[in-house]
Amino acid sequence: MGKIIGIDLGTTNSCVAILEGNTPKVIENSEGARTTPSIIAYMEDGEILVGAPAKRQAVTNPRNTLYAVKRLIGRKFEEKEVQKDIGLMPYSIVKADNGDAWVSVRDQKLAPPQVSAEVLRKMKKTAEDYLGEPVTEAVITVPAYFNDSQRQATKDAGRIAGLDVKRIINEPTAAALAFGMDKNEKGDRKIAVYDLGGGTFDISIIEIADVDGEKQFEVLSTNGDTFLGGEDFDQRIIDYIISEFKKDQGVDLSKDVLALQRLKEAAEKAKIELSSSQQTEINLPYITADASGPKHLNLKMTRAKLESLVEELITRTIEPCRIAIKDAGVKVSDIDDVILVGGMTRMPKVQEQVKEFFGKEARKDVNPDEAVAVGAAIQGSVLSGDRTDVLLLDVTPLSLGIETLGGVMTKMITKNTTIPTKHAQVFSTADDNQPAVTIKVFQGEREMASGNKLLGEFNLEGIPPAARGTPQIEVSFDIDANGILHVGAKDKATGKENRITIKANSGLSEDEIQRMVKDAEANAEEDKKARELADARNQADALIHSTKKALTEYGDKLEAGEKEKIEAAIKELEDAARGGDKAEIDAKVNALSEVSQKLGEKVYADMQAKAGEGATAGAAAGAGAAGGQQAQPQDDNVVDAEFKEVNDKK
């Protein structure tokens, strides 16, 4: 059985880890970095770039370079958060036939799980290159506050990438695993994991206990905001730069897609620099042009200015912390450790606010970029049976229920219930002789169902005629360890039953997932062909170069006809190398190798002759030296050299 890898599929960056023995290992990607930008670019020739190569070309290809796609995963197009992003993203967000938010690149509509699958494929390949064996199973992390549709969509992305997703695990819980397994502190500890990433915010209160030699991680409560993160901080900086430039130059950069992409890069860079310095300079020459000529952007920005721009965003993270503490039934003073996760927690102002709320400094010994992937890898080793000393008890982040008479949300499973869990309740009909009931499943905290998220609906038909309130219909809710919901309804009189795994009334159908899996496999085949073609071209170039060089040096030793044949074969190979037919290139490589055989023989003979001359000259010199030595009187008193052994091993 192969290893189950741990993947942190982030909004801005992603990371992959494994467990070697009991030691977690974050794996470096093909560019040598431990994290990979979650950026995907679709090129004109059909090539798909992922990570740093995609990020590098974003400025020149903004409409076809996708980033922060995780913010769209499992979401409807009409949701206000999606509508807000439409005006901000340089790429096109469109409405799918099922009402979901999809993206459009190069006249092609793509589902967010399909795009995220490209990042997961890169993570999978990174692990395979390191392990030297195929990887088919993974634990993937999601924000704790992700709802059912978002979890389901993440699982779909894994399938499209060719991974069997063994478990979906919450990011703060994964970070707690990484922290807890790394520490040898005994006794029970309550920790707060404050996770502010690129696109989402989570806070979880977790109890770590030692139970009979095994570490038990119990999530007491979780809260958050799935549309608050580093991308929003970047946007505040971008808006500020645009307004300052408009004041200064009278030009609105928000209408210029290329300029926006450059501003995005500059904003991210400024934000990072201001975490370690008090001031930075945003310098973008030739940012745009008007009738008077090119315009340059030069703007100084202080840390204080940045903090004033994003203060409201940081404050928004504190209310979920309050709710999480209350839901966990603990006091702020009961928290032993505060752990910061996500790149945004490097910002001094964020650390300051967290310290102010919890009354203590956050731990500095947890890597905010890598802890989540490490925790996922630990959970992978638990699932594969390699580790038996860890027990993880997670919770469902939001209440689940059904719509009952009057549009009321009747909660079946309340938020922060430990999962997996089951709950059943008996309901009845609202009308006389009602032949069927529609079960509408919602997720959320509002009293009325319409204020919550509809996850799905199904019918239970064939109910025998009876007065209203007489039939006994048992509705059962069952949440698995991934936090994914299965709902059933049963007429107790007839035994008739209907069950569904909640696939949001949007989401991808099985057929769509299968098609995307096939597309991904075809892409992998295309990638392989492209690599083989590149190798063939490299081989052709090397042969052309060496043959031309030999022809320059030794061509005059060949007959005119032979030389012409070689030159013609070189020309044919050059033409073939410019095309895209690997078989044609291989054939022309063989043809050139064959006709230049005579030339090769001439080169070889010449080298042998030179080597022979060198050897003869060397032998003569050697003989001279030997003769000189014989003229010296022989000294028979050979003295043994003294030596002593030095032992370097300390």
UniProtKB/Swiss-Prot annotation:
Key word Chaperone present: yes
Ranges of Low complexity composition bias in the record: 612-632
Keyword tags: ATP-binding, Chaperone, Nucleotide-binding, Phosphoprotein, Stress response
UniProt KW Cell division keyword: no
Induction or repression: By stress conditions e.g. heat shock.
InterPro entries per record: ATPase_NBD (IPR043129), Chaperone_DnaK (IPR012725), Heat_shock_70_CS (IPR018181), HSP70_C_sf (IPR029048), HSP70_peptide-bd_sf (IPR029047), Hsp_70_fam (IPR013126)
One Pfam short name: HSP70
Entry-annotated residues carrying Phosphothreonine: T200
Region described as Disordered: spans on this chain: 612-650
GO MF term set: ATP binding; ATP-dependent protein folding chaperone; unfolded protein binding
Compositional bias (Basic and acidic residues): 641-650
Domain of life, source organism: Bacteria
PANTHER family, alphabetized: HEAT SHOCK PROTEIN 70KDA
UniProt similarity note: Belongs to the heat shock protein 70 family.
Protein name in the entry: Chaperone protein DnaK
Source organism per UniProt: Cupriavidus necator (strain ATCC 17699 / DSM 428 / KCTC 22496 / NCIMB 10442 / H16 / Stanier 337)
